[in-house]
Regions:
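ER/Golgi luminal nucleotide-sugar-dependent glycosyltransferases, focusing on the catalytic module
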Residues: 1-270
Length: 270
């Protein structure tokens, strides 16, 4: 299947997929050299039910998930939200993953500038071995994120995450506990740049973990997007404790702007 946004891209060590539901704005990229957009960025539209709006100058770099060779609309129906781009990247490796050493994800409401790309280029040039490096935008203490209790369903809290941690232990031969996660921080916002091999391991884990989370949520998708985001973060933390990631590097040049948020959630279910 021909996807124009992927044609004639310059060779690159990393690729960011910038996720949007409804619109893109030039304001978010007016301080980015067009070379960096062409080389390192593609804009991923999700949820086919929502019409897309964007400036003509970005159009050559925009694609929608339904255009991909392997496409599953059920991810959006099941409220995978941003994570549907993660899965479609994983399921279309020849197009979206394998040409690069790193793959990353950002969002339409983040204002970027040249520092982001210059910094990553510098790090990849200077680091002798970057294969265990996680570039992250934001991390927060894990405890408040994994202790979300509900009057009607206590499984929203620790029991759910103990199941997730035990699955990681089974898959990776480790013995991590809830306390190992509770006392550390996790990356959030679906916003990071990950080595290709680690991303593949993260998604292999997510394929098995997310159905379990859905089941533990009483087969209700209401809170599933929240938990999927934390699931990715917990995996990246456990991989760090497992010494498969040896450093977290803070990304500069990203301003997460609430005033650019798309009110799509008020009209549609993603």
């Amino acid at each position: 299947m021909d996807v124009p946004a992927f044609k004639d891209a310059p060779p690159a060590q990393f690729r960011f997929y910038i996720i949007f539901h409804k619109f893109l704005t030039l304001e978010a990229y007016e301080n980015v050299n067009p070379h960096y957009i062409k080389t390192y960025c593609r804009f991923a539209g999700v949820n086919r039910k929502i019409p897309k709006i964007g400036p003509d100058t970005l159009a050559p770099y925009v694609f929608e998930e339904w255009q991909l060779p392997v496409y599953n609309p059920l991810y959006q129906l099941a409220k995978y939200c941003e994570s549907s781009v993660f899965f479609h990247t994983y399921l279309n490796p020849g197009l979206m993953l394998d040409p690069f050493k790193f793959v990353g994800f950002l969002h339409y409401d983040m204002v970027l500038d040249n520092r982001l790309f210059e910094f990553i280029e510098h790090c990849l040039e200077e680091l002798k071995d970057s294969s265990k490096t996680l570039f992250n935008f934001y991390a927060d203490a894990a405890e408040p994120h994994i202790n979300q209790n509900s009057v009607n369903n206590d499984r929203f809290g620790y029991e759910l995450w103990e199941n997730v941690i035990n699955l990681y232990n089974t898959m990776h031969g480790t013995e991590f506990t809830l306390d190992d996660v509770r006392t550390n921080s996790i990356p959030l916002y679906h916003s990071y740049l990950v080595p290709k091999g680690i991303f593949k391991e993260m998604m292999a884990f997510a394929e098995r973990a997310i159905p379990r989370i859905f089941d533990l949520l009483g087969c209700d998708t209401t809170h599933l997007p929240y938990h999927i985001e934390r699931c990715h973060g917990v995996f990246l933390l456990l991989h760090t404790l497992d010494k498969k990631i040896d450093r977290w590097v803070q990304l500069p040049g990203i301003d997460h702007r609430d005033d650019l948020k798309d009110p799509w959630q008020e009209q549609q279910t993603a």
